[in-house]
Every structure is written in structure tokens, then in C-alpha cells.
Amino acid sequence: MNEIDIIQQIKSGEVSKMQFKERLLDSYDIGCELVAFSNARGGTLVVGVKDKTGSVNPLSYLEVQETTNTLSNIASENVVPAILVDVETISVDGGSLVVAHIKEGVNKPYHDNRGI
């Protein structure tokens, strides 16, 4: 995926297979998103985009590193059974977006670490 592709998808807005987060503030909430994607047909989580407005708020280099690590931790610790998340970084004006691709799970049903 490149900058042009992701910008076009952002302009189309959130849909069931694509969700936006400005930042990863709530590990439980993100875990629930990953569970939903895994139980459905997969999906994409884009970090660095305001979910209400679709406006891009790029991440700094340090934020990209933290976000990537956080996503990996959530996928392995907050989702049962654990899932793999394919993460890529897309450069945009002023920084980067983290794009996490979650495949449809093969070990359904998935749930969060609280059993929900």
C-alpha cells in the first residue's frame, strides 16, 4: 500500500473492514477491534487518522515505533487465541501512518483477555 492508496481509502471513510485511530490510547479498545476483525473477514486499522473526521494526524518516528510495539503486544496478550498483525508504515506529509492488516482468523471464535 502506498501514500496515494491510503489517502484515497481515508477519504472514503471508515467502513466495517477499515477503522481509524488517531493514537492507540486504550489497549482494551484496540484489542476489541482486533477481535472483531479476526472473527469477521479481517480488516485494516490505520493509526494516525482521526476516526470522527478522517483527518490525518501523522505519527512521529518515535510514535511509529511505540505504536508498532503496542499493536504486537495487544495482538499477543489481549486477543485469545493470539493473532498475528501485519504492520506497515506509510510516509505522509509531516510523518507516518501505521497500517495494521488483520486477517480473518482460522481459530474462531476469538475473544479479548477478559473473555468477552
Region locations from a protein language model:
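Conserved N-terminal catalytic/coupling substructures associated with nucleotide/phosphate chemistry
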Residues: 1-116
